[in-house]
From Swiss-Prot:
Pathway named in the protein's UniProt entry: Metabolic intermediate biosynthesis; chorismate biosynthesis; chorismate from D-erythrose 4-phosphate and phosphoenolpyruvate: step 4/7
Catalytic function, reaction form: L-quinate + NAD(+) = 3-dehydroquinate + NADH + H(+); L-quinate + NADP(+) = 3-dehydroquinate + NADPH + H(+); shikimate + NADP(+) = 3-dehydroshikimate + NADPH + H(+); shikimate + NAD(+) = 3-dehydroshikimate + NADH + H(+)
GO molecular function, one term: shikimate 3-dehydrogenase (NAD+) activity
Species assigned in the record: Escherichia coli (strain SMS-3-5 / SECEC)
Main function: The actual biological function of YdiB remains unclear, nor is it known whether 3-dehydroshikimate or quinate represents the natural substrate. Catalyzes the reversible NAD-dependent reduction of both 3-dehydroshikimate (DHSA) and 3-dehydroquinate to yield shikimate (SA) and quinate, respectively. It can use both NAD or NADP for catalysis, however it has higher catalytic efficiency with NAD.
Subunit structure: Homodimer.
Binding-site list for substrate: K71, D107
Residue sites binding NAD(+) per the record: A132, G133, G134, A135, N155, R156, R157, D158, K205, C232, V233, Y234, N235, G255
NCBIfam families assigned: PRK12749.1 (NF009390)
Protein family per UniProt: Belongs to the shikimate dehydrogenase family.
Gene: ydiB
Keywords for the protein's UniProt record, in alphabetical order: Amino-acid biosynthesis, Aromatic amino acid biosynthesis, NAD, NADP, Oxidoreductase
Keyword Oxidoreductase among record annotations: yes
UniProt name for this protein: Quinate/shikimate dehydrogenase
Disulphide bond pairs: none
Length: 288
């Protein structure tokens, strides 16, 4: 890639950041499409996020991706949110139009697209959703919009629990999907939810390095062959949860699917051009 003074900058703001495949994926796509943009990762936490946004404006960056732990905080620093982003209460994409910042959430659309591309119809189905952070709630919101009948959200009683309750209220008031929130410590309720679920989705960082030997499913017998198990974590590619699911005979979707489809939508939002999907799948090894 021959970067010139005509190139515009796109960023990714997260902490930690060095594990991310997004810079490699987006830069390969930008180079293939012949577009004058370059994509760079920046270590930005909640404390430094406000200053980073001011920097984005000052440098006239085209936009930025937003990842943990900034997805919910970022909503406070944009001028406009899409209806889906309002429902989620978190964003993963900011587009800068001459200083006017628009916030989007492509995590949900990306993950649901990955599920649909696998041939699974979510309409009328029940999802057990692990976690209440930005990615998890985005998946839940998009699933509700696209026809899930019920979402059983499980989260620890941490700083996200009240946010989970608020999220459930927004979805229940604005869609036909019924969302309940339960403490993950209630293992009996978790077991009962899995027994009747069609989809289990991990929206937490459990399974991601350095937690690669952990899973929120402590008893593999809770997983049944009729269950579709999906991951947001892609590093490592094969998480402990996915290993458990395959041992139990479940169909699985790894975190590459969400990474690919959410990134494709981001690419188009920033550039106005189509994402070179098949090329990126090949060079990144996502189809392997």
């Amino acid at each position: 890639m021959n970067v010139t003074a005509k190139y515009e900058l796109i960023g990714l703001m997260a902490y930690p950041i060095r594990h991310s495949l997004s810079p490699e994926m987006q830069n390969k796509a930008l180079e293939k499409a012949g577009l004058p943009f370059t994509y760079m990762a920046f270590e930005v936490d909640n404390d430094s996020f406000p200053a980073a946004i001011e920097g984005l404006k000052a440098l006239k960056m085209r936009g930025t991706g937003v990842s943990m732990p900034n997805k919910q905080l970022a909503c406070e620093y944009v001028d406009e949110l899409t209806p889906a982003a309002k429902l989620v209460g978190a964003i993963n994409t900011i587009v800068n139009d001459d200083g006017y910042l628009r916030g989007y959430n492509t995590d949900g659309t990306g993950h649901i697209r990955a599920i649909k591309e696998s041939g699974f119809d979510i309409k009328g189905k029940t999802m057990v959703l692990l976690g209440a952070g930005g990615a998890s709630t985005a998946i839940g919101a998009q699933g509700a919009i696209e026809g899930l009948k019920e979402i059983k959200l499980f989260n620890r009683r941490d700083e996200f629990f009240d946010k989970a309750l608020a999220f459930a209220q927004r979805v229940n008031e604005n869609t036909d999907c019924v969302v309940t929130v339960t403490d993950l410590a209630d293992q009996q309720a978790f077991a009962e939810a899995l027994a009747s679920a069609d989809i289990l989705t991990n929206g937490t960082k459990v399974g991601m390095k350095p937690l690669e030997n952990e899973s929120l499913v402590h008893d593999i017998s809770l997983l049944h062959p009729g269950l579709l198990v999906t991951e947001c974590v892609y590093n490592p590619h094969m998480t402990k949860l996915l290993q458990q699911a395959q041992q139990a005979g479940c169909k699985t979707i790894d975190g590459y699917g969400m990474l690919l489809w959410q990134g494709a939508e981001q690419f188009t939002l920033w550039t106005g051009k189509d994402f070179p999907l098949e090329y990126v799948k090949q060079v990144m090894g996502f189809g392997a």
